[in-house]
Swiss-Prot record:
GO terms for molecular function: pheromone binding. CDD domains: PBP_GOBP (cd23992). Residues 1-23 form the signal peptide. The lineage of its organism: Eukaryota, Metazoa, Ecdysozoa, Arthropoda, Hexapoda. The keyword Lipoprotein does not apply. Disulfide bonds join 42-77, 73-130, 119-139. This is Pheromone-binding protein 2. InterPro entries: Odorant/phero-bd_Lep, PBP/GOBP, PBP_GOBP_sf. One of its GO terms (biological process) is response to pheromone. It comes from the Eukaryota.
Length: 164
């Protein structure tokens, strides 16, 4: 049985963990919503079908597996437009700033960059750049879910409807 001090300490730890996850979910949500703003321009530029909208709308759903090559092409286009990647790969400085612009503190922003960097290193060296970026995105999604930072489907749907 816990004594009063142990119970208070346990409550403080639980609250601090909750508060660390909630803002991180907000950061990922805000980054995602801003990231997709250029989607129509990328679809037009690359002549991509509207079917990729479903992948973007459901991206953070744990049960949704993204397999469409065109979605990888769109992610690559959006990342380039936001200057998050260059010809040599992830642009760490710009990605760090992008996370901070969407509410991340230094620690969360660095963790996001580290996750993206780790995923870039972990994906197989595929010849097709769209498929490579798709694998990179799937890795990042899985890592964000492990941290419990993925925004809920309900929150994302409500935010997207609010933007329309």
């Amino acid at each position: 049985m816990m004594n009063h001090k142990e119970l208070v300490l346990f409550a403080v730890v639980c609250l601090s963990l909750y508060q660390a996850v909630e803002p991180s979910q907000d950061v990922v949500k805000d980054m995602s919503l801003n990231f997709r703003k250029g989607l129509d321009a990328c679809k037009k530029e690359l002549n991509l079908p509207d079917t990729i909208n479903s992948d973007f709308n459901r991206f953070w759903n744990d049960d949704h597996v993204v397999t469409n090559r065109d979605t990888g092409c769109a992610i690559m286009c959006l990342s380039s437009k936001l200057e998050l990647v260059s010809d040599t790969g992830l642009h760490h400085g710009n990605t760090l700033e992008y996370a901070k612009q969407h509410g991340a503190d230094d620690t969360v922003a660095q963790q996001i960059v580290d996750l993206l960097h780790s995923c870039a290193q972990a994906v197989p060296d595929l010849e097709d750049p769209c498929l490579k970026v798709l694998e990179w995105a799937k890795c990042f999604k899985a890592e964000i879910h492990k941290l419990n930072w993925a925004p809920s489907a309900e929150v994302m749907a409500a935010e997207m409807l609010a933007e329309v």
